[in-house]
Amino acid sequence: MHTDYIHIILADDDEDDRLFFTDAFSELKINTKVHTYNDGVELMNYLNSDEAVLPQVLFLDLNMPKKNGIECLHEIKSNKKFDDIAIAIYSTSSSEEHIEETFVSGANIYIKKPNDFDTLKKVLSDVVAINWQYHTSGLNK
């Protein structure tokens, strides 16, 4: 998919974290469209719908009610339709066990949620810049 913006989705049950995330993107000088979902069930219902616009980057919180980030990751990785989505786990956990499990399950990157806004903007900017280079260079084929 070639667009002039990067479509980003965040699934996170914490409203403050969702606002922090969208505010950070609104301050970055990167052309993005950001959509958020409250939990894994809501996210997967959207991704599996006929009207879904698949994101280039999907940020998944690990600990969500109904369907957690690992369950979403497994479901996404089991469907070829989602092969081009870069998946970033976005969590408060820095447990090596959690980190290893996410990479073994197919995540592309693991991000520990930053405590301050400037660090969050830097991390998100770096992730999007790497993804943008990947997609615009044709490496995703």
PLM regions with names:
Residues 39-42, 68-74:
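Acidic catalytic/metal-coordinating carboxylates
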Residues 58, 110-111:
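Two-component signal transduction core modules
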Residues 64:
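Receiver (REC) domain active-site loop signature in two-component systems and cognate sites
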